[in-house]
Design a protein with these regions (language model features):
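Class I S-adenosyl-L-methionine-dependent methyltransferase catalytic core
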Residues: 1-137
C-alpha cells in the first residue's frame, strides 16, 4: 500500500489490519512523519513500514517501488492549504487490479477529477465537504 500525504498514518495502519503486508508512507512535514513513525512503533508495526519524508509531488517511482507497483494507493492532500494537485500520474504505479483512492474537496472539484469522471475513468463519491475519487486499474 502506498499512503501519500500520510499525515498520522492511520490509513496505512488500517490497511495493515486488513491484510496489507507492507505500507510505503510519504509525508513531508517532519513533525507529522515523526508522529506517524511513533504510532507504528506503539503498535509494533514499524517492520511493516517504509517511511519517506519527501514532497509527494517530486517522488521518483523507481525509488519507491523498485520491486513493482502497489495494490492500493491512498492520497489525502491538504487541499485546504494548497491547490489540489493532479495525481493521475500515480495511477501508473498500480498493479493490475489495483485501486487508487484520493480525497478531494467536494466544492471546487479539481478540473482533472471532473474530466476523469465525465470520461468514466473514475468514480466520485461525495461525503459532505470531501469526496473520494476512485480509480481501478
Amino acid at each position: 500500500m502506498l499512503d501519500l500525504f500520510a499525515g498520522s498514518g492511520i490509513m496505512g495502519i488500517e490497511a495493515l489490519s486488513r491484510g496489507a503486508a507492507h505500507v510505503v508512507a510519504v509525508e513531508m512535514v517532519h513533525s507529522q512523519a515523526h508522529l506517524l513513525l511513533q504510532g507504528y512503533k506503539a503498535l509494533s508495526l514499524e517492520k511493516n513500514l517504509t517511511l519517506y519524508e519527501k514532497n509527494v509531488l517530486t517522488l521518483d517511482k523507481e525509488e519507491l517501488c523498485a520491486e513493482g507497483g502497489f495494490d492500493l494507493i491512498y492520497a489525502d492532500p491538504p487541499f485546504k492549504d494548497m491547490d489540489y494537485p493532479d495525481l493521475r500520474s500515480f495511477w501508473q504505479w498500480l498493479n493490475p487490479g489495483g485501486v487508487a483512492v484520493f480525497e478531494a474537496p467536494s466544492r471546487n472539484m479539481p478540473a482533472w477529477v471532473k474530466e476523469a469522471s465525465d470520461a468514466g475513468t473514475v468514480q466520485v463519491r461525495r461525503y459532505g465537504e470531501s469526496s473520494l475519487v476512485i480509480f481501478r486499474s
